[in-house]
Amino acid sequence: MRVFIVKANEAHTDYDFSLKDLPGTSGRIDLICRALNSAFHLSHSFRKNVRVYVTLLGPPSPPKTIRFEGPKLRPKILNPDELSIAKVIIKALNAGKNLKGSSTKELEVLPGVYVSNMTFEDVIRKNIRMNLYVLEEGGADIMKVKFPRNNVAFILGDHIGLSEEDLKTLEGIAKKISIGPKAYLTSHVISYVNIHLDRIGVP
């Protein structure tokens, strides 16, 4: 199983934004939609070996974490266009209004789609037994990293990135790696990682 853990620093946690202007009104949920597209969609098929956690930390009621579980997801639920994916996120946020407190309990919204009040740190703890990698400039060249055959998890930020506090939290538990010398779009990083794992035969 491949896991991607994405921190969405400003993504709204309620449906108080316009679908006609996702970049300008949603805290860049459009970036999350593209990241999900890159995580799951191939040209003529759908990746069932992927799990994605997105922790939304924007207004008005952070945090909200949405988990997308590839083995249970139906491709018709997560269509490749941004608008369709945004509507799935909205459905999860609306369902998440019923969650109270800081519980890590998840609520299934659709087959393979779950929402919770988990923090970014909760998600990391939940995946602590995975082989954790954090995508950051200055990390080890991904081409030179020897990945295990399974249970790999990749942690990355949105356009804002991970904070210094996040990186300190991850020290000693996640290996810092990089796909190149520049800052890349989250969706592009996920695509690159997926392609690289395909190439080297990691399921």
Swiss-Prot record:
Its main location: cytoplasm. Its EC number is 2.1.1.257. One of its GO terms (cellular component) is cytoplasm. GO terms for biological process: tRNA methylation. Keywords: Cytoplasm, Methyltransferase, S-adenosyl-L-methionine, Transferase, tRNA processing. It catalyses: pseudouridine(54) in tRNA + S-adenosyl-L-methionine = N(1)-methylpseudouridine(54) in tRNA + S-adenosyl-L-homocysteine + H(+). S-adenosyl-L-methionine binds at L135, G157. Pfam families: Methyltrn_RNA_2 (PF04013). GO terms for molecular function: S-adenosylmethionine-dependent methyltransferase activity; tRNA methyltransferase activity. It is found in: Cytoplasm. The keyword ATP-binding does not apply. The keyword Transferase applies. CDD domains: TrmY-like (cd18087). SUPFAM superfamilies: alpha/beta knot. Belongs to the methyltransferase superfamily. TrmY family. PANTHER family: TRNA (PSEUDOURIDINE(54)-N(1))-METHYLTRANSFERASE (PTHR40703:SF1). Homodimer. Specifically catalyzes the N1-methylation of pseudouridine at position 54 (Psi54) in tRNAs. This is tRNA (pseudouridine(54)-N(1))-methyltransferase. It comes from Pyrococcus horikoshii (strain ATCC 700860 / DSM 12428 / JCM 9974 / NBRC 100139 / OT-3). The lineage of its organism: Archaea, Methanobacteriati, Methanobacteriota, Thermococci, Thermococcales.
